[in-house]
Amino acid sequence: MVGSGAPQRGSAAATASMRRRKPTSGAGGGGASGGAAGSMLQFYTDDAPGLKISPNVVLIMSIGFIAFVAVLHVMGKLYFVK
């Protein structure tokens, strides 16, 4: 692979060439409102495998998990005090 013209995956040259690429679809090219929204929406396609949940559900589940761990921590501290 020494003489193949493409840079190795993960190298700085490969990263730089990925940054220089222009988007070929119409979703990523808009004006002020289309830049971030177009790149974010491409992750939420209908043919993507896995669960289809909104970012709000992920946020609520994360906060619930953090609260659950905090409650377990407090219960553990109180249990060992007795």
Curated annotation (Swiss-Prot):
One of its GO terms (cellular component) is Sec61 translocon complex. Residues 1-34 are annotated as: Disordered. The modification N-acetylmethionine is found at residue 1. It comes from the Eukaryota. InterPro entries: Sec61-beta/Sbh, SecG/Sec61-beta/Sbh. Keywords: Acetylation, Endoplasmic reticulum, Membrane, Protein transport, Translocation, Transmembrane, Transmembrane helix, Transport. Disulfide bonds: none annotated. Residues 1-55 are cytoplasmic. It is a single-pass membrane protein. It is found in: Endoplasmic reticulum membrane. The chain crosses the membrane at residues 56-76. One of its GO terms (biological process) is intracellular protein transport. Its main location: endoplasmic reticulum. Pfam families: Sec61_beta (PF03911). Heterotrimeric complex composed of SEC61-alpha, SEC61-beta and SEC61-gamma. Belongs to the SEC61-beta family. Necessary for protein translocation in the endoplasmic reticulum. This is Protein transport protein Sec61 subunit beta. It comes from Arabidopsis thaliana (Mouse-ear cress).
